[in-house]
Amino acid sequence: MNGLIIGMDLCDSCTHISCQGQETIWSVPTRIGKEPDSDVWRVAEESAGGALEGMVVEDKLLSLAMKDGTATIDGVRYEGLYLLKMFLKQVLAIPRQASGKEEIENLVITVPKLEVKLVDCLMYCADFLEIDRSRVHVISHAESFVYYVMSQKREVWSNQVGMFELSENGLHYYELRVQRGLRQMQVVADQEELEESFHLNVLDSEAGIQMADRILSSCAERLLQKRLFSAIILTGRGFAQTDWAADFMQQICKRRRVFAEMDVFTRGALIRSEDLCEAQSAYHFTCICEGRLKTTVSLKIQEREKEGQLVLASAGDSCCLLYTSDAAD
């Protein structure tokens, strides 16, 4: 098969798409418009201003689908799941048109918070789009962060790696550490939504900028302390420019490698998508993060007077795959 290999960062505010062989990362506001008195649905890329002029527009499609909500558009009531299906259909048309390919070989979707119901919704979307479920994988932001970092040079992840995300979704902190064992290396990633979060519109005023810089500096002092980090990453729209956060930058740059990457999650999703297409993974580690089991689950058994362990699920197995397997049974 020589189809499209895609990584997608799907959030309530904006969706980012990357595709193997394409340098462009497409950004599309997570909203859909319908032309009046027709069955034509459209999305608009941010590069085109994200405008859907003359259309009835519905946004926050993930939240709408998750709460089984509905929206009335042009006098017709639509389920949130249906609107999400139409949105993904339009979004996937972008890399299809750019590459001239229709078939999707593998699609990895990364989401801010991994929930069983959301995975179900996205699998229903795959059915609607006639993409085999075996080619669709849903992972957490933490897991895409892991694959992005582990694809870098060893010097980047030789010690702990911290990442601050400042976006429309709020302020989040991620931390990765590598645990080397006798059998296999474990990569553990934690994520935290910070209580000190603020909306990006506070950066529109000088007073708001000063407040945001103080908040970030306080968070960095509490989270990083004097620990050794091989890298600190900044991601999200709020860090598109960093000169406004002078005190924060000064603090995190002390004896640390710091770099900004706006598309960590979609790049990580694409890396994971590419790896899943290989006969053997290039990443020889057990990933422990949101959406993955932290410990091995086993039963103590006795067979012919000998005791042993029956492993039901291993550390690093996908929780969503386990759920899907149970549901199928």
List the model feature ranges, each with a label.
Residues 2-26, 151-187:
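Gly/Thr-rich phosphate-binding beta-strand-loop-beta motif of the actin/hexokinase/Hsp70
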Residues 163-178, 280-310:
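Extended, charge-rich low-complexity interaction segments
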Residues 145-150, 156, 173-212:
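Short, flexible helix-coil linker/hinge segments at the edges of structured domains or between repeats
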Residues 1-3, 133-163, 264-286:
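Conserved phosphate-binding catalytic cores of ATP/NTP-utilizing and phosphoryl-transfer enzymes
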Residues 14-110, 115, 188-225, 229:
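Conserved phosphate-binding loops in N-terminal lobes of ATP-dependent enzymes
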Residues 82-150, 262:
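Active-site neighborhood for divalent-cation/phosphate handling
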Residues 107-119, 220-251, 257, 261-262:
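Glycine-rich phosphate-binding loops at beta-strand->alpha-helix junctions
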Residues 323-329:
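Conserved small/polar residues in nucleotide/adenosyl-binding loops
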